[in-house]
Design a protein with these regions (language model features):
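Polytopic transmembrane helical bundles with strong interfacial aromatic enrichment
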Residues: 1-155
Length: 155
């Protein structure tokens, strides 16, 4: 794998990112905007699943746009994250905090969309098991947020 990561660092995209502070800053800012969209939408969706937000709206009315926003935020963050990763692929891939961040990202997204696709979305009210799923989902998203912050601060 190290040879793959070393090769990634030699690509023109990786070199351009590594050699431009302005490009790195712009990509980082856009990456954080995408992450903010993901986290805000996940918070909104899961608070609704918990029954703690927007009682006048059905779960489906809240989850549909929130899930779309999560997907847009993920697309933004994954794209910019890949560009940022390319510049330092070898070092970043060996970083345990980064590895945990990627594991939590995959787990949180998979869990969120697996739970969000269930049929309770179409029923009125919030089922008790849906509340439990929302609590787990929120925990995963917040663990991701803390780990992402740790990666930024400790890197």
């Amino acid at each position: 794998m190290d040879s793959l990561f070393a090769w990634i660092e030699t690509t023109s995209v990786a070199r351009a990112t590594a050699n431009s502070l302005a490009l790195t800053a712009a990509l980082s800012a856009i990456h954080l905007l995408g992450f903010t969209l993901v986290m805000g939408s996940a918070l909104l969706a899961n608070l609704k699943r918990l029954g703690a937000l927007l009682p006048q709206c059905s779960v489906a009315e809240v989850l549909r746009p929130a899930n779309r926003a999560i997907l847009v935020g993920l697309a933004i963050s994954v794209t910019t994250g890949a560009l940022l990763f390319a510049a330092r692929a070898t070092a970043v891939s060996a970083n345990g905090t980064f590895q945990l961040k990627m594991l939590l990202l995959l787990t949180a997204a998979a869990f969120h969309f697996a739970v969000g696709r269930n049929d309770y979305v179409q029923r009125p009210g919030v089922a008790p098991w849906a509340r439990a799923g929302a609590a787990v989902s929120l925990s995963l998203w917040f663990a991701l947020a803390v780990t992402a912050c740790a990666f930024i601060l400790l890197e």
